[in-house]
Amino acid sequence: MFKSVLVLLAAAAASSVAIAQTPSTGRWKLEAAPSGCVVHAASPSGTVVSIWGIAGQDSLSFLVQNKAWNSFADGQRYDIHISFDEKKPWPMRAVARRNIDKDGPGLTFAVSPNHAAGGASFIDQFAAAGGMNITRNGQRIETVSLDGTQVALRGLAQCLSQVWAASGSGESEAESGASVAAETI
């Protein structure tokens, strides 16, 4: 799905990692590279949601893509709002990317797992929600189902934990046979 992220992760690799075994929901796919992990899922409307982390970094990156989103200018920053199950929206500054991959243009933003408002973190709300609404200037851009998100984020956390633990081995990329592994969760 977001192959360029996986290529970046593999290129920055120091060692290989095994994927954590997690129950399958059939909706989210987990991919691991030696320096990070990504989960992604596609909606029936063609929108793809990807979340990735690189071991040791303090935020998770989100990418929401749809082939129909042709009005976004590449590299342009957009103020958007993300809300979950009609809760108070989270303001985000997203950057548009046009030529990413076959899933189309998208908006990307980063969130610290500790980023909280009103007692609940963005990640906690994301994991617990049935849906995510994305708006800009009061207009709906997309609404995405988040079925299976708790399992996907648990798999992402386990994968990042394994990558972080393995990163201290000092092995070179060539020695490790750096590869990308995938699993549907």
Short names for language-model regions:
Residues 1-7:
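Bacterial N-terminal signal peptides that target proteins for export
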Residues 15-18:
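N-terminal signal peptide c-region/cleavage motif recognized by signal peptidases
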Residues 20-185:
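A generic "folded-domain core" signal
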